[in-house]
Amino acid sequence: MEDYKAFLDEKMNKVLLSLDNEYKTLRTGRISSNIFDRICIQYHDRRTPITQVSSIRIPEARLVVIQPWDKSILNKIEQAILNSDLSMNPSNDGSVIRIKVPNLTSERRQEIVKHAKKIAEEHKISTRNIRQDLNNKVKKQEKESEITEDCLKRILDDIQKSTDMYIKKIDSILESKIQEIMEA
């Protein structure tokens, strides 16, 4: 039975880590270089995140400076940022890209909150799918007489309690992210 708990915790913690990584790429009131993690360009015949081909600095609260290691990709980076969903207007001076980051409008904040809720729901679904897979494995063991019916009920109950706990964690992470988006 302990094997199920360890397996469940490992899978559920991966879901929480994935949620955290996705939330790092959302723009909030505070600017972070993580928002550029998902922006990619074609570089040496493969899609490459701009974070891997340039340095990204934030010298001021509302200014981002992107300095590619290869100047020939400046235009590609600029175009990728323009085509992204970040609503930013980069300025290319021939050696670096500067982005003056405007304050988020209330409409844009609402869009980001909506997207954050969608991401949280996707991760809740992943959590429920993990629960369903584990429930099916345990039920199969009971059918094959590897565990008793009482043990099955106890394990299923533990799985449900753990699932509920992880879904509450996802809700808590979502609430703090919404608060972060709405302030500043």
From Swiss-Prot:
It holds the Pfam family RRF. SUPFAM superfamilies: Ribosome recycling factor, RRF. It comes from the Bacteria. GO terms for cellular component: cytosol. It is found in: Cytoplasm. Signal peptide: none annotated. GO terms for molecular function: ribosomal large subunit binding. GO terms for biological process: translational termination. InterPro entries: Ribosome_recyc_fac, Ribosome_recyc_fac_dom, RRF_sf. Its main location: cytoplasm. HAMAP family: RRF (MF_00040). NCBIfam families: frr. Belongs to the RRF family. This is Ribosome-recycling factor. The gene is frr.
